[in-house]
Amino acid sequence: MRRLLPVLLLLALSACSTTVGIDYTQPSEVDMSSYRKLAVAPVKAYEGLWINTGWIQSVGESPLMNVYPTFSTDKLCRDTASYAGSQLMGTLSASGYYELLPPAETAGLISSGYEALRDAGWQAVLLPEVTLMDLSEKVRSVRRMTRERGADGREILGMETEYILVQTAVLEYTLRIVDTSSGEEIASRSFRDSRTKDTWIDPTHPVYDDMDQFFRNMLRGFNKGINALLVPVRQVYDAKLVKNKPKLKAAGAAYDALASGDRLTALALFRQLWDEERHVPSGCNAALLSASEGDFVTALELLEEVVRETGDGTARDLLNDLSGVSARNSVGEQQTAGLD
């Protein structure tokens, strides 16, 4: 029985669907290929954050309670802008796509206008701004029953009121990109998020903490969108190989080769079975493996041939999907042309 296990395993691998990764370059949403020498201005802080501390009626206890922040709103706005700047520079620097002029140096040049940046060789300037910070709040009370034992051992029931400060923070962060030669805006995008936090308030010490981390978390959440906006990146499209149905015994060797990691042998076998037997799964799989080797032209031509001759729905779906990946890859490669 032991000697049969490897055989059974190979049969299982041959019958199952295997995922093949197809590498491609996902283009950035804004084509920045002509603006890789990028000056980054300091983030403009939001002006106007105001927090309503409000008086809260304390049901059944002290008549009024005032809740006080323990931080300066001006400092919070400045710190948020500073953190946004460090995150932005970190994201762009890590991409390796740009030659960057740091905010401090950009500020010195941009004060004389875009021409000064252009004359210094910078093709575009990124103007980041925190365009909205809002912190709305309310206090809600929760009443719960308490149970205590009196001196005589009898249970005493009571009511206790607890207070919860509910804070909802909203942050909007806007990036503008300007061509330093023409002064025209290349692109603009705003990122917006909101978060809610509940804090239990002690009526004897009704204060709440600095909201700095609250806004920092939202800024970190923008990094992925900023990267997609400005940086072409390598990604992987995972495609499932087509199962051996209708089953062709000769195709088993191709699936086995793939299961053992020999993609080139699997590709050659699948292609041969399509050319000689017109076996649709083999034709589809040969196309996907060609794409995984970076040959999108051969892959698409083969899938077009399969669809044209057989009208197979699976092949048509693969053709549509792979055409989209190939198109994105072409744009992405244009954006990264000349990049080391």
Predicted regions located by residue number:
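Sec-dependent N-terminal signal peptides
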Residues: 4-14
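Flexible, glycine- and charge-enriched loops at secondary-structure boundaries
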Residues: 6, 74, 78, 212
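Structural motif
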Residues: 8, 30, 117-118
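A structural "domain/chain start" motif
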Residues: 16-97, 233-340
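Long, contiguous interaction/recruitment modules in multidomain scaffold/adaptor proteins
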Residues: 80-245
